[in-house]
Amino acid sequence: MKSKTLQRLLQTAKPEKTSLIWGFIFLVLSSGAGLTYPQLVRWMIDNVVQPKKLDLLLPTVGVLFLAFVIQGIFGSLRYYLFTLSGERIVLRLRKKLYEKILSQEVAFFDQWRTGDLMSRLASDCATLQNTVSVNISQGLRNLGQVLGGFGFMFYTSWRLSTLMFVLVPPIALGAFYFGKKIRKFSKQFQESLAEASIVAEETISGLRTVKSFVQESAETDRYGKTLEFSLIAAKSRTKSIADFMTLALIAGFGSVCFVLWYGGREVILSNLSMGDLTQFLLYLMIVAIGVGSLGSLWGDMMAGIGASQRVFEILERESLEKTEGIALKEILRSIDFKDVHFSYPTRTDYEVLKGISFSIVVGEAVAFVGPSGSGKTTLGYLLSRFYEPTSGEILIDGKKISDYALKSLREQIGIVSQEPILISDTIEENIRYARRDATDKEVHDAARAANAYDFIVNFPTGFKTRVGEKGIQLSGGQKQRVAIARALLKDPKILILDEATSNLDTASEHLVQEALQRLMKDRTTLIIAHRLATIKDANKIFVLNQGIISQQGTHDDLIRQTDQIYYQLVQRQFET
């Protein structure tokens, strides 16, 4: 594990210091109790069995049983403390990862696919959870038994122990060699699982498209192929673990055969008692079992290291968003775009905006129209600071928007988009999403103003009606009116309407348009739209084409320019 990753993991474990210290104490006590029974067996053979002292047999066995009881109690406490601490460590790690993902700039999500991020939150954290909560505890226990066993073996017979140490270098080299391979294959396995998660997430979220094109079989095959890649990595990882376990077990139990030969010879030559040989063999079995268990745990530990590297790759990434600045409490004068150029970070070779300049006076409703891909929606993204301009400036009351605290800037902006996204909760909580401390009355008033109250109360559970994933249980018009109610409750100074009525039928559009008029009152509004009903009353209209402003003026001014784009757009709408 890289030192920085280990340092971050230890830092996350710091609040569990007390539990981990007690867990370590119980680990030492349980391992110590487990290491006493070979001594007791030796004493029983040399002082009870061989001298045939029947009166001492039951008390000796009783003491042996007591040692096992003590080991069991301390072992249980050790497991409880280590496992619970590990669960809490990974819980904090998962929360930090989620918080870090949400803190990233919007451009980050253009580059990272949702399935990959979900895989790191779910699969990688689960692997790491198993490593931190169970494997480390078991690994420390086995390591303690191995080291303690070696110590008592030296105490029993230094000659036998010295000969046994010949086996240590090959096992250590094997652990290093196979550990490197296991870590590599584990990371490949996690990455291929992430790819499978991406495919599944894309397919399920776009299920209607999949079914409409009858692509269920093709998507199943695509998912199956990504799983095959993970199976190949899993096979390689499992083979490496199996090879290492084989090496460890052969070395461990091969040493038992060696001890039986050499130790038996020492007993015959009277250099070692039968009790000493039995004690040595029992310690050797403890060491062999410990080494074998460490072999299987080693693979899991390497998988955990691979998962932790993927988790900390996100945790160590600093967001490019500048969040600090002065508070934006009100807008007094204007919003100004000055020679703004912009390219999306994932398409730096294509310039979406090419020197855009305009000014919006506070309280005005300004519309932006133009062909698809002309950069209309991008203006709203830049004003909300989802992205930063490549060059040029965006000002509010003469100050760059980057000088304002990001939170306070976005608190002053309300967005109603073409396809509003609702959270999978109740209608009430979706409206209250704008302001968590809003009262029920404020929520209901916002719904009335958005022409949403009547359809909401007609549901059997009213405002407690669950909307489903992304609001799938509601119609397009209903979702839009809930989104408008949410924006009304937020009470922003700046409003961005991004094609807010383009997907609605005539009846729904009328209700939504009426609600939008209430929403726009006394607010500075940027309207991105095609429909004439939305833009004809705007104070000013800007026509965008290929990233530049080709026309500007009121509807009456622009409609008279019959050879220009605006006139053509309006005529095309009437034709349809």
Task: Give the location of each predicted region.
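Membrane-integrated ABC transporters
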Residues: 1-37, 49-63, 78-86, 93, ...
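Short intracellular "coupling" helices and adjacent cytoplasmic loop segments at the cytosolic face
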Residues: 87, 95-119, 123-125, 198-222, ...
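Transmembrane helices of ABC transporter permease
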Residues: 15, 19-32, 70, 134-188, ...
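An intracellular "coupling" helix at the cytosolic face of ABC transporter transmembrane type-1 domains
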Residues: 106-107, 123-132, 136, 140, ...
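Juxtamembrane loop-to-helix connectors within ABC transporter transmembrane domains
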Residues: 4-5, 13, 82, 100-147, ...
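Cytosolic ends of transmembrane helices, especially the final helix of ABC transmembrane type-1 domains
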Residues: 212-215, 239, 287-314
